[in-house]
Each structure stands twice: as C-alpha cells, then as structure tokens.
C-alpha cells in the first residue's frame, strides 16, 4: 500500500522530512501506538516512547485525538503495520478526520515486509504476519552475533519464530493464546463457561476445584508447556545455541519456563520503527 495523506505535508517533502514519526501496531486485540524518538539508540534499536493502547474492535476517537495531539504538536507521519485490516482502516480514517478537523498535517503509510531490514527465507513473505516479521527484524539486531534466535510473542495468538545466525527469518509455529483457547471451549461446548485465563500473569491453581478453575488450569499450564516445548524444538532445530527473546502482553506467565529468555516488551513496535527508518530514508 502506498503513502496515504491524511493531510498534505507540502510539496517536495519526503514522507518523514521534519515530521514527528508515529508508529501503529494494529493487532487482533489491541492497537499499540508509540512515538519514535530515536532511529538508532545506543543498543542499535530505535527508541519508542509515549505508548498508548486502543481496543482493536472499537475505540473512542477522542482517545486517539488526545494522544495524537499530545505527542505530535506539529506535522506528523504515522507508519501502520497491521494484521487486522478492519481495525487498520478505521484507525486511518479516524486519523484523517482528526487531521482535517484540527488542521494538523498527518501523513499515513503502511509498513510491509519489504520495508523491514530482514531477509525472509520463505516462498511467500507477503503472507506472513507483519507483526512476526517486525519482531524478527528487531530480534536479529539484538541477538548475539553469530547465533540464531527464537522469538516468542505472547499475544492473541502465540508465535514461536526462528531467525538464523545470519539474520534470515526461517518461520516458526503459531498457536492460540489463552483468550482464544477459553473462547473456543465456551463456543464449542454447551456447558463450559467463558473464563479469563492467565490474567495479570498469575498462574492458576492445580488442581482446579471448580469447572472455571479447571479450565483456567488447563489453559494456563497447558500453554506454558506448549511454549516451552516449541522453544525446545526450535532450539534443537537451530543447533541448540539459539538465544531466546520474549515479548507480548502475557509474557510474564511463561518467563519462568524460559529462564534464559531476554524480555523486550515492545519488540514489534521496535521492529516497525526499523521499517519506519527505511521508509524515511534513514
């Protein structure tokens, strides 16, 4: 998708020239927003700040407007990476409306796999979720030199992906996250209730002494076991010396089963920032 102008930033200017650079990670549950403060910080990764989360399935425009006007007092460009097209389209339309009504120039551009500093060793890279690729791009910069890496992203879905020692994205595994597992049990049976599993990273009791507690135990401990096994399989496939990088909203729930993992909370946004750097000619 090419550049989309919510408001023109003037003739002859590049997509980011002189503008505040904003980032949007549009996921299945949340839209994660941030401002890009530094294209290349000391650790080699961009610095993101002023984080704001919105509900992907419905957010109040006023919340987006307050954040947007607070982080970008002048012209801005927002780089959008999305795995949820309807939410991304609504975000872009709302940004365009805010730009028009407040007379603040805001340009918009989608980030695709071709914008990331990442070689994708798959036949159809355009079909891989941009969130997975963005996380891998960031991980390839922070992993130890000469070693492969396994990236675990704990979101609506869990992804366990592999980056080769030379930085190539090799693919990985995807499984439902705890909320999806709970919803599948509630929707696919006549009597099992919907439960909240792994809320706040708290581990459920085992044995569960009610139906709800038993579901929470099955999901909570089951997903921890699944993640640990997938990481072990990925490390074995890579020769056993892969670094493990952990991110996502409920990452704390699996941290103890991945004791050697390095936790990077905003790994996907950081990867999107790398794509922004390329899009902005940095």
Task: Give short role names for the model-derived ranges.
Residues 96, 125, 259-266:
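Active-site regions of enzymes building and remodeling cell-envelope glycoconjugates
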Residues 63-77, 98-99, 230-242:
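Phosphate/pyrophosphate-binding loops at sites that engage ATP/ADP/AMP, CoA/4′-phosphopantetheine
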Residues 262-282:
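Glycine-rich phosphate-binding/hydrolytic loop that grips phosphoryl groups
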Residues 176-237:
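Active-site rim beta-loop-alpha module in soluble metabolic enzymes
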Residues 4, 8-45, 139, 146-169, ...:
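Gly/Thr-rich phosphate-binding beta-strand-loop-beta motif of the actin/hexokinase/Hsp70
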Residues 40-90, 179, 184, 192-198, ...:
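N-terminal phosphate-binding loop and adjacent alpha-helix
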Residues 107-110, 115-188, 220-230:
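Phosphate-binding/catalytic loop of phosphoryl-transfer enzymes
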Residues 74-84, 106-109, 238-249:
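Short glycine-rich phosphate-binding loop at a beta-alpha junction
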